[in-house]
């Protein structure tokens, strides 16, 4: 029982964080691509905060669903 609970927590905590971090990596990558294309560095803090909040709203539920699905598959695979 303890192993199943640990596996559940591992999948539920790891995948939401992974999806959120990958989504947040898009901000600096987008700024770098914008700088290379236009030659100017345009950083608007209000827009970046909106992007971070949107990424958190989307990344956490997607990661939670992925984590639950992988946890269920790992239980089915053990049997």
From Swiss-Prot:
GO cellular component terms, semicolon-separated: plasma membrane
Membrane topology of this protein: Multi-pass membrane protein
Record carries keyword Magnesium: no
Record's subcellular location: Cell inner membrane
Coiled coil: none
UniProt key word Lipid biosynthesis: no
Keyword annotations from UniProtKB, A to Z: Cell inner membrane, Cell membrane, Membrane, Transmembrane, Transmembrane helix
Main location: membrane
UniProt superkingdom: Bacteria
TM stretches of this protein: 12-32, 51-71
Cited function: Immunity protein component of a toxin-immunity protein module, which functions as a cellular contact-dependent growth inhibition (CDI) system. CDI modules allow bacteria to communicate with and inhibit the growth of closely related neighboring bacteria in a contact-dependent fashion. Protects cells against CdiA from the same strain, its cognate toxin protein. Growth inhibition is reversible upon induction of this protein, occurring about 2.5 hours after induction, and requires an energy source.
Assembly, per entry: Probably interacts with cognate toxin CdiA.
Protein name: Immunity protein CdiI
The species this protein was found in: Escherichia coli
Gene this chain is encoded by: cdiI
């Amino acid at each position: 029982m303890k192993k199943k609970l640990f596996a559940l927590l591992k999948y539920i905590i790891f995948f939401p964080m992974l999806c959120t971090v990958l989504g947040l990596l898009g901000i600096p990558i987008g700024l770098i691509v914008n700088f290379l294309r236009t030659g100017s560095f345009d950083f608007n803090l209000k827009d970046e905060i909106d992007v971070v909040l949107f990424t958190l709203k989307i990344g956490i539920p997607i990661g939670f669903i992925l984590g639950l699905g992988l946890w269920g598959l790992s239980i089915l695979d053990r049997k």
